[in-house]
Structures are given as C-alpha cells and as structure tokens.
Amino acid sequence: MHRRAGSSRQIDIKLISCIRCLSQTILGCMAAIHANLEKVQPAFKNGGGVAWGDQSTCMFCAVARFFRPGYQNHLVSEWLPALDGVVVKLERGARVADVGCGHGVSTMLMAKAFPNSEFIGYDFHPSSIEAAKAHAAENGVSANTRFEVATATNYPGKDFDLVAFFDCLHDMGDPAGAAAHVCQSLKPDGSWMIVEPMAGDRLEDNLNPVGRLYYGASTMVCVPTSLAQDVGAALGAQGDEARLRAVITAGGFRNVRRAAETPFNMILEARP
C-alpha cells in the first residue's frame, strides 16, 4: 500500500499495476472481438453459438494477456493462501488440475511457486494446449507441468488435491456436469477453486465500469461459446454468486464459500 503525502487515502500499488496492464490488454481483446463479428452476428439471429475453436485466431492469446495481470498479482500471494490448507499441501507436493487452462498462464504461475507439486493443464482447444506446452518450456516449468487436450467433463484422474477453474466455468456448455466431474476427480479432502468474474446478484449491482466490460465481452464471446456446446447453459460472465453456488452444489459439493475477491474476480472454494 502507498499513502500520498497529506492524504488519508491509501492506494494499492498492485491494483494500479494490474489496471495499467489491463488497459493495454483490453485493446487486444476488443480487436479480437471485432474480427469475429461476421461469425457472431448470425448466432444472434438464429439463436446458435460460436465454437471457441472458431473464434478469431488472435482471441486465444488476447484472452491470455487479458487475465495474466490479475493472476500474476493475486494468484500465489492471495488466492491460494485463502483456501483451506491448500498451500501446505502444495509446498509438500500435491497433484493439481488446471481445467480450461488455455495458454497455461495460471498453470505456470502455480508451478513456479510450488516446484514440489505436479500441475496438469487441461483444455478442449488443441491449439491452446500446444501453445501452453511451448510457454512451459520457455519458462522452465516443464519438469512439473504437463498439458493435455480434455474437456471439463472427461479429463482423467480421481486423486487431485486441488482442481482449479480460472475464468472459464461460465463459458462451459454444461457447468453442472463439469462440477459433478470435478467432485469425482478430487481426493476426499480436496478443494475446487473457482475463479469467476466479479458480479453482484442483481443487475443494478453490476452497472459499473467492470460490469459493463464483462457484459460486453460476455455477449460477444462467453455466451456464444457456451451455446455452441452440449446443454448450452450460457451462464455468461456476469453470472451471479447465487447462480454459481447452485451449479456447484448441483454437482455434489456440500461446502461452498467465497474465499477471496478483487474488483475483477470472485474466488470460490468448494469442498465435497
């Protein structure tokens, strides 16, 4: 924290850094969305979706750049410590699934911080998995990471200490089915970390700069992506916490709590 001379207001330096980076990455995302207009417009007319793999090719790296500042500033220092007993497990050596990992930004940050643990990134988009493998090699974390093509309802394994979903549950066609699969893939004392865009339970709670940003991106990217999949729940990037909790508990989780938050994200922890 920093306090300006003669002022009682405190400024979070990490948040300023994050906002500066975010303002730059937003431009990339807006360009990617614009490049995809010809595919999204018919979906508005016929009620269908646009598959994630059919998005503009610049969308995938733009999304990775968009979320990276928040993950760099908060994931290891705040979000993981807010989970019940997870950091101790990671320090000793845990097995972690990062589902919907994209280019592997979140996976690599955790792998660097906890070299004794094994991190497996899963994504249903083959090109993103190939990019994640390349990034892991470039960043020197190939020893305790690997990346595989799989969906949130069929990734292998039933012995994970931690399963993490970073800003992707709302993009899935069948989030309740994904929740049920996570529940089956965890150890009895395992945890599911769900990082989702910050949203209030009422529309008027979200009429702010962050909410407007997420509503726009959700309309053009998140909802069409979900509608293109089986079930097509279309939660959207402003799915409120009550709705997320309903999805999580429908998957078999009994304990759900908000573990941490930032102006841009809420972090939920679910346990069987």
What function would you assign to each model-found segment?
Residues 95-97, 109-153:
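Class I SAM-dependent methyltransferase SAM/SAH-binding core
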Residues 195-250, 257:
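C-terminal alpha-helical "lid/dimerization" subdomain adjacent to the S-adenosyl-L-methionine
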Residues 153-163:
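A short acidic, Gly/Pro-enriched loop at the edge of an enzyme's catalytic core
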Residues 252-272:
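Core SAM-dependent methyltransferase catalytic element
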Residues 2-94:
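Conserved Class I S-adenosyl-L-methionine-dependent methyltransferase catalytic core
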Residues 104-108:
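Glycine-rich SAM-binding Motif I of class I
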Residues 176-188:
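A short glycine-rich, Lys/Arg-flanked "PGG" loop and its adjoining helix->strand segment in the class I
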Residues 161-175:
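A short SAM/SAH-binding and catalytic strip from SAM-dependent methyltransferases
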